Each structure stands twice: as structure tokens, then as C-alpha cells.
Amino acid sequence: MKTEISTADSLRDPPSNGLKADSELVIREDIDQFLPSEVSSLGSDHQNDGEDSDTDSDNFLQDPEDDVDEESTGRGTVTTTSTSTESRGRPSSCIFVASLAAALSDDELCLSVTENFKKYGDLARVKVLRDNANRPYAFVQYNNDHDAKHALIRAQGTLLNGRRLRCEPAKVNRTLYLKNQQSIDFNEISQICEKFGGLEQIVPDRTDNQYTRRYTYPISSANSWFVQFVYRDDAIRAYANLRTDPNWIIEWAQNINVPKNYNLLHKSKFKSSKYHQNNGIINNDGSNNNDNNNSNNNNREDSRRNGDVIEEECGHVHGSDSEEKLTSDGIYDDEDKDSEITIDKRSIFVGQLDKETTREELNRRFSTHGKIQDINLIFKPTNIFAFIKYETEEAAAAALESENHAIFLNKTMHVQYKEVGGRHNRKFSGKNGGSNFNHHQFFSTRSGKTFTGPELNLAPPPINMYRKMSGGSQQESETMMPYMPMGPMPMGPPPPNAASLSDFDMFPPSYSTFMKGMMPLRRKSMPNSWSSPSSKSVNSENESVNGGDENSELPSEIPESSGRYNAANSFTTYNNSSAGNSNNNNNNNNSNSNKSQYKKRYARRSSYGYNEVPPKPYYFQPYYYHPMQYHMGPMGPLHPSQGSAGNHHPYMMVYPMSPPPPSGLDGSMIPPPINVSQSHAANHGSTHVHANEFISNDTGDINEDNKAYSLDY
């Protein structure tokens, strides 16, 4: 089905494939696809109101008493069916109140603000919110501008709960930023948006316009537009309807402030009235054919002057499949609806209700916005919520705007549209989910623009169009290092060519089976036992504090008097010293180091060269006691003497540790013979041992300073 899109003031030039454009046949499916069935367009009822609707855009913010049943727009008059202007509340009648007491709850603040501001005028509602820093603020909505201005003057600087209030006119965001892959004319964008409510401003975005350097601002055709509504709930309803179409980019933007001549809604009042009378959509009797022909010829010249040439086959309404249908929301009826999210614009979700809530109370509260079809109140053990369905979209939008964050039974409610379906992932996607439009190529920012027009400043969207991500925060979802248990690790065998343990690492990567799949990064909270070029100073500091061992290249700066070691309060490490070396346990980590020392040793992550030196695995040393010297009798056949038969060799009694040392060690791994005094030489080979052999005046070489060891069994 080939569709021709009607422009507001001109006919499109025929496409390159030779299709003949029929100026009398205009199909408006591209506009009506975004509109629900119950929202009527500005049809023939307004064809004679064109000249009478030349109202200034500044007259939109007038008192509600002047238009109880109708709201005036620059394009005509839009009649409100189910929501009166008193219940909606104009943005000009809203006050922003800051500097509230953060110690109070939102419910208490809402009640106190209501009691304080209702004395200044007819109060409609009060909402209390908090920012990211947990600072509370409130929006106070009055029913007319006079009371709002009176409250701004009288309430400024007054005390409430021990705090001086700061009052300002509320900046109610009600502007949409619309972007399409095709260039859209001003009248088309106005027809699409004005059917959701009254409009204040329609301003083209100059940034993405392809005729930036050729023509002056403002232009009548662009790919992206700023549309500001009179009421926020109308903007919310338009946002919910248009955002579900994959060919549109709809963003909730901050309000724009441009001069009147940049507002095309104000400049084109006369053209818009001509459009309603002569575009052929309203008049079907042919009475204005001459006017149509003349206006079409003139508009065709204006279109060529502005470079406004668009193909008649629109990319988002084309298709040869007759079975392809559009829903009222403008979404293709695919078979993968489970993967997309839809908004039921007649139903609202009401959460955070009080446990005493009943259907009658909900009906009494929410029926003020429109006629209710159904109320589904659900009680959960920890949550109470309800789904309320209205007969019209206007009533649901008014309830969403009025009741969200409002007080009901002394609790703050949470109100939003009812969501149906899964995650929305169909933006710029084709019939079968394939991408048919490259957003970044087409909408790339162009340099050399000659006009500084309104810029897009995004604002938080009023409704949640997508589901929240489950799980923890981003920091919790980061890949963490594997946890290393605190316990003894088996010592791998040395390489074949290694002469001693000092010639190779304790656990090289090839011998570390438990470190498979370990990432080459290290968490800041975990100490490391490997050295990098940037951490040599840190390791040097540790070795100087711990004393090092006798074969260390860095001398110890700690005096010998401070070298007493308590074996019960530390973890010792394997090093290249023998079992009888008194310094074999000095290379350790001080478990009692304070926080400042920890920060010194382990600097920031940016100071480590991760990709320069591969990390060594973490190793937690097993606990063992110091070796003690005990002189034994003659060695039996199962314990041959390590020295000659004529030398007395004491047996080094070492407490066992798991696992036992591997067999087949090199000769350098065996402790060397220890020289003993000649007075004990005669004891070698005797049948009994004298008691004085175990006195403390032994002259062995293991402990030359006769340092006492505190053994904790």
C-alpha cells in the first residue's frame, strides 16, 4: 500500500520512480496513526474558526475563570471532555518551595506545607519530593494565578519547621522534542501534537536541519521540533503515545525560551487558518478548488525556495503487504509483542497505599478526575497497590498528574501509567525487528551552523517507559577477583634447573593450578604479594620494616634490639634461608598495621602498571613454630646421622606443617652442620644423656645473641 503524506501548505514533488502525485487524493494515515480512536481531530467542526482563533501565545496563561469549559490555543479551541481546568491546574499557578526540613518525613512535610500555604488562597494540591542529596522540596498548586502570586509574595522567607522557605515560580517541564527520519512540515507536526491538548510553542530545531547554511531561521520544515504544551498532562499523554512508534525519537525536554518570531505557532496564524479552509481535507465539495490550486502553486514555489522536497513514500508508513496493520498507538502488530512494552493510557497504577485502603475510598478519591470503569485493589504482605481504569485517556492523564506523590490516608501515593509487556526495544526497527534506519548517520551533528537556536536540554521523563534493571548497583555487578581462602597452600616443586628456592618464584603461573582464569587486575581492597616497576618503593618499605633475611640485597634499618619476634602474632613466609636461620620469619605482613599504613603500602589503582608485569598469585602462609635445638643420643638405623660419626649433631626438632616437604630435595636444601662445643663431643654415642646438656649456656651458632623465643603452644 503506497501512501502519500499531505503537507500543510504544499504538495510534494513526485519521486524519482515516476509515480504521479495526485493533489486531490490525500491520505492522513500518517497523522491518525498516532492518535487514539477516542481523541477527535480538528475536523470540520473547526473549519470556520480559523480567522477567529488568532490568539496570542501569551494568552494561554490566563486565569482559569476565563475558560472553564474550553482552553484557547493558537490553532483553535480544544474542548475538554472529562477534566475541568480547575482540577488540572495551570503551570503558571504552581509554586516551587525549597529549604524544607530534611529531618521530617515526606508525609509530615506534605501536611505541614499544606497547612501553611492554604491560608494564601484556594489550594489545589501539594507534592513533596527529594533530590539526589535527600533534600526535600515541594510543588504547591493553586487554582488561579492570583492566589499563586499572592503566596509568592507572602510566603517568601517565612519560617516553617524551623527553616526559612524559598519560594519561586515553578518551572513545569511540558515540552517534547520530536525527531523523525523524514523532514516534517510545521503544519503536520502541529496537527499531530495539538490533538493531545493546547500548544504554546512550536519551534524547529536548527541543529539537524540540512539547509542550515542556505536559509535564515526560522524554517517551516525540519527533522526535529520543540513542542511546548499548555498543560503538563497533555504533554505526558503525547509522550506516551508518540514514544512507542519506532520511527520517532521523542524526548522529554526542558522548556525553551525563544522570541515570538521564532515561535511558528505565533507567526503562522494566518497560514494555519487558510490551511483549515483550503487543504482539501475538510472541504470535499470542491467549492475551494481554485483556491486550492492557487495556494498549491504558491506553496510549491515556497517549498522549492526552502528546499523542502520529501518523497511521497514515507519510510515509516510504506509496505506492500496488505496484512500489515497499525494499531491505535502506531505500532506494528508483530508476533513478538512479548518483547515490547506498551502503555495502557486509560489505566493507572497506584502504589504505596495504606493498609486500611478500600475500593470505596479509592473510587471516591479518583472519580473526581473522570468516570472509572474498574478498580482492582491488590493486597500483598509488604505492599498494597491498585489498578484503576478510566473510560477516557484524558481522565487517566489528569489523575496521573494530580495524584502522583499526593497524600492519601496519611501516605504518599505513587501513580503512573499501567505497563503491559516486556522491554521496549523496537526503536528504529523494521517489521521483523531488523534495523531499517541508522540514527547516528542520519542525525549526526553538523558543524558551521549560522544560528544559535534553542538547544536540547533533557529533563527526567514523567513516566517510566521501560522496566528497571534488576540486580544491584554497577559497582556490585563488576567482575570481582576470586576469593582466596585463608589457609595453607601446597608448595609446588621447583623447576629442574633451580638451585634453591631463591632462584624461582614461590608459585609461578605454570605451577598454580588454582589460579586459572584469574584476571590481570587487582582489587584495591586486597593486598598483593607481587612487585611491579611502580611498586618497588612499596616493597622496599615493607622489607625495611620487616627486616628482610640474611641474603636480602636491601639492608635492614631496624636495630637488633627491636628484632625480637613473637611467633604467635604473625604469619611467616617461606624464603631461601635454612630451617635454623633466625631470620627466616622476618619477611611477613604486619597484621596490626593501622589504616594509614595500609593506604601507604597499597597506593591507588592508577599507580600500578597492570600490563607491564604479570601478577603473581596470592599466597597465604601456613602457620608454624620456630625450630628448636635438642641434642639427641645416637642415631638409629632409621635416622642416619647427617654428619660424620665423630661429630655431634643436634637434631632439629621442627613442628610438622601440612603438607610435608617434597622428597628428592637438592643438597643445598638440607641444613648445614652446626658447630657445637668440644665439651659435648664426648656425649656422642653415649647410652644416656646428662641433664646439664639442656641448660641455656649452649654455645650453638643458631642464636648467637641468646635471644629468648616465646613459644605459644
Swiss-Prot record:
What organism does the UniProt record list as the source?
Saccharomyces cerevisiae (strain ATCC 204508 / S288c) (Baker's yeast)
Instruction: Give the protein's recorded name.
Output: Meiotic activator RIM4
* Positions with biased composition (Low complexity): 74-90, 278-298, 526-546, 575-594
Q: Which PANTHER family match?
A: SERINE/ARGININE RICH SPLICING FACTOR
Induction or repression? Expressed at elevated levels early in meiosis. Expression depends on IME1.
Instruction: Quote the function comment for this protein.
Output: Positive regulator of sporulation-specific genes and of sporulation. Required for premeiotic DNA synthesis and meiotic chromosomal segregation. May act in a nutritional signaling pathway.
Result of changing F349L = Leads to mild sporulation defect
- Kindly list the organism's lineage: Eukaryota, Fungi, Dikarya, Ascomycota, Saccharomycotina
Q: Does the keyword Ubl conjugation apply?
A: yes
UniProt GO cellular component terms: cytoplasm; nucleus
- Gene Ontology biological process terms from the UniProt entry: meiotic cell cycle; mRNA splicing, via spliceosome; premeiotic DNA replication; reciprocal meiotic recombination; sporulation resulting in formation of a cellular spore
Keyword terms: Meiosis, Phosphoprotein, Repeat, RNA-binding, Sporulation, Ubl conjugation
